[in-house]
């Protein structure tokens, strides 16, 4: 079945040569080095210390097990050519809460159920449906998770002498202030030094992985100066040198029903982040992932991680991006990344005991900053009030209540607002391409029909009819990928788009970026008042340029002709204004 055929097999069928392997080898090793401190940090942040001791497990080792097993399975079975799987920051909040309340058995149960839910989502072809989750909801809970991750690292970053960190956000900060006097100067200095190293290398030498440099440098300093700083060895006793023998996890059937909402949240987070990562990768390599195949791979990856004592996994956007930038072209790079981590465990695991926890806290603080999406957050706040409200509600619920509640309430609220807006607007249709033989637009009674105009070769004209909401945003991407070759000029008619939301604007921004990569000039025609105001408030007008937006199709076609070096043509005498501001020019 082509829909579920892994990209790894498809690549091998097409032919895999030495040049591709060399690129994948370099990328895989590079990503493995970058993933090393992240995997350990995610494991430490996800499992409470008391739970780890009671279950006899090592949190940093659990992170590495997940990166190796899930990372290999995602690449081997996935629907994306360059996706890198493993533990991510998005899971820290939900995993920590489950482990703290239900113990390791509860976490294994929830992760296993989440794996089967992901398999079911993929088999039932829910890959396209998950893309309809509105952008403000995703940004809201992602930014909320970032705040929680940052706040959870204060204890290790400053070396505070306190017991278990409270799970509640407010209680957590109360505890920090109560124990602020116990901060440890060497620990804080190591944490600040690690954070500064990561930030400065990212700013001035982004090709060098700042996290691994910070980890190596701080480990050497702490060891040589014999500083009183907690390390992986002092708290967890080191890391095993090999993977454990796969075994049936301590699944609790009694807890299964109670943990079903948490398992569903893990599955939804894994699905959303993995498909977002795949979309980002598509934009970088010009490909197209198989969403349903990717969900099936994520399901097997989470099931496999549980059998090796791991934690939930998904596609990692940062590592996937690093893979592409390092030259990765095929799933082989992801499998090499997993093997690289396995070799580290076999050869260098004794040295991992010297890694300071303050440095890993600094690594996670940078992860939190990257997850915060502050620019997108601000942009949505300037979007229509309904989108801003959904964003703030999802963000607030994530930080102050529970991630499971936040995702559910955010999706329901966005759906209700969407249905209300759709009910208020008539004449809604889908994205359509105008051709001379299109019955709906070739009627003689339509004076602005495309068949009345001469469209030059090298110019494509598409039209969006109806409100451009999150439910329609993904369709424009599908239309783009059906084009055999990029045109010189792409005209997008928006005369029938009366309303656009933040997800629609985000889709247009990605569309514009793709056009720029393809050497295509994007022109918008017939932009109404509400979309124009939304463009201006969100900054899209500055991105595309006001010179590329026109009140009617005829002006846009003449601009396209000028781009192609062709003479302009007069508009048909029967043409009528398409938008209100165009009436003065007719």
What are these regions (language model features)?
Residues 84, 524, 549:
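Conserved SAM-binding loop
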Residues 1, 560-586:
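Intrinsically disordered or compositionally simple regulatory linkers and C-terminal tails
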Residues 543-559:
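Short acidic-hydrophobic, aromatic-tinged amphipathic segments that line or gate anion-handling sites
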Residues 1-439, 472, 519:
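Transmembrane helical cores of multi-pass ion-transport proteins
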Residues 339, 531-532, 551:
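Short secondary-structure capping/turn micro-motifs that flank functional sites
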Residues 95, 173-176, 476-480, 556, ...:
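Generic hydrophobic alpha-helical segments
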Residues 370-543, 561-567, 585-586:
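The feature marks cytosolic C-terminal regulatory regions of anion transporters and related permeases
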């Amino acid at each position: 079945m082509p829909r579920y055929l892994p990209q790894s097999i498809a690549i091998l069928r097409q032919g895999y040569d030495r040049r591709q392997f060399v690129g994948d080898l370099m990328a895989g090793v590079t990503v493995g080095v970058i993933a090393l401190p992240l995997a350990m940090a995610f494991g430490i942040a996800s499992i409470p210390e008391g739970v780890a001791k009671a279950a006899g497990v090592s949190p940093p080792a659990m992170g590495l097990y997940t990166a190796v097993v899930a990372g290999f399975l995602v690449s081997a079975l996935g629907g994306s050519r360059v996706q890198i799987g493993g533990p991510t920051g998005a899971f820290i909040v939900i995993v920590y809460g489950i482990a703290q309340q239900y113990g390791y058995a509860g976490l294994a149960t929830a992760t296993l159920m989440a794996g089967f839910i992901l398999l079911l989502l993929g088999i039932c072809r829910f890959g396209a449906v998950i893309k309809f989750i509105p952008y403000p909801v995703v940004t809201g809970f992602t930014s909320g998770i970032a705040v929680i991750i940052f706040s959870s690292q204060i204890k290790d970053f400053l070396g505070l002498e306190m017991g278990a960190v409270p799970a509640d956000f407010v209680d957590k900060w109360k505890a920090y202030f109560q124990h602020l006097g116990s901060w440890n100067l060497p620990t804080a200095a190591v944490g600040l030094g690690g954070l500064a190293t990561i930030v400065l290398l990212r700013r001035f030498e982004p090709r060098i992985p700042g996290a691994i440099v910070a980890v190596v440098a701080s480990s050497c300093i702490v060891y040589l100066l014999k500083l009183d700083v907690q390390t992986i060895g002092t708290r967890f006793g080191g890391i095993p040198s090999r993977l454990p023998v796969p075994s049936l996890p301590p699944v609790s059937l009694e807890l299964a029903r109670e943990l079903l909402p948490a398992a569903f949240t893990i599955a939804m987070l894994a699905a959303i982040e993995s498909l977002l990562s795949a979309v980002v990768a598509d934009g970088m390599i010009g490909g197209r992932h198989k969403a349903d195949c990717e969900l099936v791979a994520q399901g097997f990856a989470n099931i496999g991680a549980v059998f090796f004592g791991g934690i939930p996994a998904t596609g990692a956007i940062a590592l996937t991006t690093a893979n592409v930038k390092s030259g990765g072209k095929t799933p082989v790079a992801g499998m090499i990344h997993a093997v690289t981590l396995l070799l580290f465990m076999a050869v260098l695991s004794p040295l991992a005991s010297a890694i300071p926890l303050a440095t890993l806290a600094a690594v996670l603080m940078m992860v939190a900053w990257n997850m915060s999406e502050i620019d997108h957050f601000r942009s949505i706040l300037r979007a229509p009030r309904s989108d801003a409200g959904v964003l703030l509600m999802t963000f607030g619920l994530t930080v102050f209540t529970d991630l499971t509640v936040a995702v559910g309430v955010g999706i329901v609220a966005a759906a209700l607002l969407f249905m209300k807006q759709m009910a208020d607007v008539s004449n809604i249709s889908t994205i359509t391409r105008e051709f001379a033989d299109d019955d709906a637009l070739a009627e003689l009674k339509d004076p602005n029909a495309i068949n009345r105009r001469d469209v030059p070769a090298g110019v494509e004209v598409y039209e969006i009819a109806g409100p451009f909401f999150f439910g329609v945003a993904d369709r424009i991407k599908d239309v783009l990928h059906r084009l055999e070759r990029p045109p010189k000029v792409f005209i997008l008619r928006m005369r029938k788009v009366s309303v656009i939301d933040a997800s629609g604007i985000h889709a247009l921004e990605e569309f514009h970026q793709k056009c720029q990569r393809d050497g295509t000039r994007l022109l918008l025609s017939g932009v109404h008042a509400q979309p124009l105001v939304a463009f201006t408030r969100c900054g899209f007008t500055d991105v595309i340029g006001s010179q590329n937006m026109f009140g009617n199709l005829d002006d846009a076609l003449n601009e396209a002709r000028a781009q192609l070096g062709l003479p302009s043509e007069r508009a048909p005498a029967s043409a009528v204004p398409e938008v209100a501001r165009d009436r003065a020019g007719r």
